[in-house]
């Protein structure tokens, strides 16, 4: 292994790490390997920013590869060296024209291989060894399809007339899951052929002529490899899998993208992998993408009801194995789901089914962790977790997710729709014996709903409910005829109606095959959910019945009144008539699981090892009892930062001395709301850059916003910072755009000092988003985010825990309730301090923290508990906070340039250039650098050279000037301090987000019991009471880029920064010193007076800044940066930039756009893609430009300034200057015409200017 990796041997397993591991990472890897080697479960907490993901990936993959005895960097090369022959029919030895002329049917199969070898490593095929892969079937099917329009998104399936066959000659064909439509088969007239019987083999076809060239088969994509070769590597003589797969689950798809980026930087980046995702993220079909319910639409297309099927689905075989994906498609390193989607679009192959097919040879499978907990999703994805390793990252919400996975809710409207559809099937004599019992189930539930709707108890305004225990519901189900004995029969009927069949019947003298209709996708989904929860209720002699509560809830919704035609069938509507709305009662039947161990029972006892990790697992004592899993290995790791890097304090009173206790009663008062607003304003004036403020609920957020708008405090906040509010609900794209406005306001701050983002605990902002460096210099939490005590599910859960706390060891209801609050609070606090060199303040506003610390502090994360300080008065807290912020801000302004010579502590891959972005993202570029090399020298600025930098500045002193910060790929430009004036760009007001059933009559139905006559006992089985069941506790089984060294001055407002262009050439490394860079005192004082938001500490006129570029004395592997742009995507920043315009293009644009004025667009938000300055003719030498107000982002950015033209290295600099745009100055400026995007204005409040 190359020396570029740090090597550790833990528990006999050799681990290659991309840098010197932190102590917390070593502790995590040690715990993980102990659990994997001993097949025990792990519960590990490591603070956010401590490198938890890398420790998980490296240790688990190193352990997995140690079982096969191959090094980490040889896994892919071994597979690539295996030469696999094509197994298609056109290459088989026994394929002859005589066979085709005789019209005999042929199997396009792999060479004869024992099933155990062919499918041994697939976790999805361990229980069914004869299962054939989807790619093999589709490849064979592609050969049989001769007339296909390659440019059409659909293929019309051709029907073939076959000779009548005897029963022994019937060729049953396997359907690739319940969602897939296959080619038709012909049998004796009037007979029915099942297309997805479990006993079927792969498809058989009888083409009328030999298949074409290999372009029709998998050889066309150089995919002709059989799965046996890679499988036999991992098989012993018994055919059983020796090496477990790793299922890596996390909370969201965005977090999966972050994990795969981490994997790409390790020695294990070439490991075979796949990412399971929903159709919302992977479907590329144009008809499905625009559909609201993509699952149902996809299933309808695959059914091919209109004679058409999804063409993307039939191209899955092109990229459905790891060898093809890595060797021929160039995805040899860890990839993201977006890359697979792009490849699927290019090759017309469905990414959704491709990802599922890649499971077979994958060593690690990434997915949202509800894919592993939800029984329906596991069945749909065909996941078998037996003897596998399950790692669940960000698992602080795993209890809630497990409860939701075992719960189900269905509306009365859905039940009626399903009943009517099933009734239509019965009336048309379509598989009547199977549809009738299912119809009876729906009818029984509807009648029971209607009968109990009159006895609902009112809880809140326009809401009522009634609750039953699980045992009471079992008695009700038994009266309906649904019992432990009849339920398996119902499951059999349901499986039968999902099978696709064809009926052969003579039409006009010819025999035609017609597909037997099946119930709609929506009815299938509803019945699957209902049968899933009934299965839990009846499982193991109703073991989990006491863990359920069944509730009927009634709410009201406003719907448009239906227009009814007259007796003649005419419908007359007045031209200006407003459609009337009516209030309609909505009934919902809920099956609520109160015990997360129910869902975990499918996993616990089957998997080899479960690893739960998060940065906020505290308090950890509830996981074992709630999940029913014994975590023998537990760890609470320390943070990697120093105590001086974080300020943690509690504040119990506001600026006016009023007590701040955020209980429900207090938050309703104007005094509390005004005091919180004054506190927030003071913190915004004290801490620069980005501030996050988290509130307990959206309801409180709306109250505070309304109050602050009426009192004018909101306006005062907007004078200091750009104020943005997290929207409740809404589209994801709208939220991403709003978040981009927040990042831009910090990155390109103008007259305002950063931004304030007001959000809600448990909302989108508090979970899974990274606010490193300037994006979150302070996190303020108001109150303690307890769940809504009046919520029915919260109330039932508290009662459940109180009832079972002694018998099952569960936490009492009150403790469980408080733990939910602290987990949400810890998640919000975790948005700050995202890497080792980050710093920030955590401000907990509530008097309860100080008055009762033993109760309210114990639930916080360990690293927060260790540093928390209680402040008796607001003044003392603000003074301490100001000192902390000033100290770090001053160090930041001088030391940003020092970060450039620090070893990248998380990436040592060799590259040829550095990429810098502006202030908030400079720190991200050096976010994980080793602190050993950190030099805090305010007099000298060290710039580390990679290869051969050429500094275009000479060693002679420069004139007093302001050298502005620039974006990554933009040229450097220099600006003299006395020749320009500050440009003020105001932000405009942005609007807030604006958000945006059919009842069928039924006559009668027959009892469900008649469908089981003679099959089941009619006596009612004895069901234990809730007390009896409680007494027996259940058993829980490189692209080149210019490098810019940014050297900001020490002024707090960062009104000017120094940018030095560093280009890499072939000359030897050298040292260039910029010395004696002095700032004119008079000019500095003038600049200070022009900045209303500046602190009193102006830039010291005697400070001398020097630029030193030294030879790197460390190995290249210890100082290289990774050039991939994905590290910045978590900030939603642009990753691509437009190329520079030529001189001719600039002149053309100047002539076209002449005459437009920037002042006409001064109300636009300071965001991206607004306008671009091309030429500025006149220069006022008495004014200074504030450079950071006009930073160029050509792709989405604000002002694009004409590049400085540097002609020679002797310092002869020709610069295009920026002029004053205010007060009727006679400057001539040419800008691009533009129209601000409305999406950029969403989420902003009135008065935002």
From Swiss-Prot:
The protein's name: Fanconi anemia group J protein
Recorded consequence of changing residue 52 to R: Abolishes ATPase and dsDNA helicase activities, preventing ability to unfold DNA-protein cross-links. Does not unwind G-quadruplex DNA. Disrupts BRCA1-mediated double-strand break repair
Residues annotated as domain Helicase ATP-binding: 11-442
EC number, UniProt record: 5.6.2.3
GO cellular component, one term: BRCA1-B complex
Biased composition (Basic and acidic residues): 1110-1122
Chain ranges for the short sequence motif DEAH box as given in the UniProt record: 393-396
Free-text note on domains in this protein's UniProt record: 4Fe-4S iron-sulfur-binding is required for helicase activity.
InterPro entries (alphabetical): ATP-dep_Helicase_C, DinG/Rad3-like, Helic_SF1/SF2_ATP-bd_DinG/Rad3, Helicase-like_DEXD_c2, Helicase_ATP-bd, P-loop_NTPase, RAD3-like_helicase_DEAD, Rad3/Chl1-like
Cellular localisation: Nucleus; Cytoplasm
